[in-house]
Amino acid sequence: MTEPDTERKGSSRRGFLAGLGAAALTGAGIGMAAGEVLRPLLPDSDPAASPEAEQRLRMAAQRADATAAPQPGISGPAPAFVHVIALDLAEEARKNPDTARDSAAAALRSWTELAARLHEESPHDIAEGAASAGLLPASLMVTVGIGGSLLSAIDAEDRRPDALADLPEFSTDDLHPRWCGGDFMLQVGAEDPMVLTAAVEELVAAAADATAVRWSLRGFRRTAAAARDPDATPRNLMGQIDGTANPAQDHPLFDRTITARPADNPAHAWMDGGSYLVVRRIRMLLTEWRKLDVAARERVIGRRLDTGAPLGSRNETDPVVLSARDEEGEPLIPENAHVRLASPENNLGARMFRRGYSYDQGWRDDGVRDAGLLFMAWQGDPATGFIPVQRSLADQGDALNRYIRHEGSALFAVPAAREGRYLGQDLIEG
């Protein structure tokens, strides 16, 4: 490449950043602006041949849908990075139900207002010197949840929906209290880790007088920029395609799966139209998993490792045929395969929408790798979603249990956003 060409490309990039920054401030037309000006920078610059490339660019350049129901961060394309933070009311605030209620209202009001600003602006527009300065919106999204323990603190147990009952103990649990529970939950996602970090810092600081962090975990998945097909189901750290069985977001089953039904009890109506999030910290025993050959791994899961297809099938999205047998009459999908025991057919139709991430904390002091799955499952009621599926996996001998450890667990109610009201206001002030 000649020197004049290099200069022109550098100039073009600077011009693009300036122009796209202006488009980001206006909000409108950002997707078009990103696609048009970034095409010359792509390895394959033929726009007709690379619609996937344009989609990659949009994830970095666009803003999240602030009107997504019940809150942003549940539907739509999943960003590459997420930070889940569980918080408790400060000790001083828990002295009595009145102070707890006032502090909860202050925290939820602050997060609602700040989340709205973050969806419209950027962290560096809100706080001078933020780490995200100079970066695009990166699909930043914020979700706010409420734990059952908060209702106890504000003396509102009578307003606790059955769906927010404590999760039962499962026979395979190896839970650590420091990674469980929480009065509140913040899920913050973005396509760029610096944008994510800057937003998390502002959100935690906004309620620092009323709350304290209980636990947090950062997760990641493949970026849109690196994906050959941004719509493809991502893989986890075990190399599995993970999330194939999710209901399609454009299918009526999706809303039926994630949305809380209208309550029979008016005291529980604050969660009408909301959703329930189960979070599990699942450490993978990757050293043991690596000892298995590909065929053994596929028998554990019940799917092909390369394509994600159910054993005996050809395509990832082919239905799981539990009755299929080989020439010798043996089940093509083993009786203890993960996909068999987790299937709706094996669990009275139980379904959830999984939107999980990988996590990697490096190596512990004892030399053990601390990496695995930040499991997140959305449903209208855990009793017809996560609970029966997890009970089946735990009690019926899921072959995957040998290679994973459930070390953290929490359940949060995620109320629907309502015009002119802060998140959870119907609970706190209702």
Swiss-Prot record:
Main location: secreted
Signal peptide bounds: 1-39
Annotated PROSITE patterns: DYP_PEROXIDASE, TAT
Cofactor dependence: heme b
GO cellular component terms listed in the entry, alphabetical order: cytosol; extracellular region
UniProt keywords, alphabetically: Heme, Iron, Metal-binding, Oxidoreductase, Peroxidase, Secreted, Signal
Temperature-dependent activity: Optimum temperature is about 25 degrees Celsius. Thermostable. Retains 50% of its activity after heating 2 hours at 60 degrees Celsius, while no decrease in activity is observed within the same time at 30 or 40 degrees Celsius.
pH dependence of this protein's activity: Optimum pH is 3.5 with Reactive Blue 19 as substrate.
Region (Disordered): 42-75
EC assignment: 1.11.1.19
Record's cofactor remark: Binds 1 heme b (iron(II)-protoporphyrin IX) group non-covalently.
Compartment(s) where it occurs, according to its Swiss-Prot or TrEMBL record: Secreted
Tree of life domain: Bacteria
Post-translational modification (record): Exported by the Tat system. The position of the signal peptide cleavage has not been experimentally proven.
Pfam families listed in its UniProt record: Dyp_perox_C, Dyp_perox_N
Residue ranges with Low complexity bias: 60-69
Binding of heme, residues: H338
GO molecular function terms attached to this record: heme binding; metal ion binding; peroxidase activity
Effect listed in the UniProt record for changing D242A: 0.7% of wild-type catalytic activity. Still able to bind heme
Catalysed transformations (reactions): Reactive Blue 5 + 2 H2O2 = 2,2'-disulfonyl azobenzene + 3-[(4-amino-6-chloro-1,3,5-triazin-2-yl)amino]benzenesulfonate + phthalate + 2 H2O + 2 H(+)
Catalytic residues of the enzyme: D242 (proton acceptor)
SUPFAM superfamilies in the record: Dimeric alpha+beta barrel
Function in brief: Peroxidase that is able to convert a large number of compounds, but its physiological substrate is not known. Shows high reactivity towards anthraquinone dyes (e.g. Reactive Blue 19) and a modest activity towards standard peroxidase substrates (such as guaiacol and 2,6-dimethoxyphenol) and azo dyes (e.g. Reactive Blue 5). Is also able to oxidize aromatic sulfides enantioselectively, resulting in the corresponding (R)-sulfoxides, but with a poor efficiency. Does not display catalase activity.
Record family assignment: Belongs to the DyP-type peroxidase family.
Binding partners and assembly: Monomer.
This protein's name: Dye-decolorizing peroxidase Tfu_3078
Organism: Thermobifida fusca (strain YX)
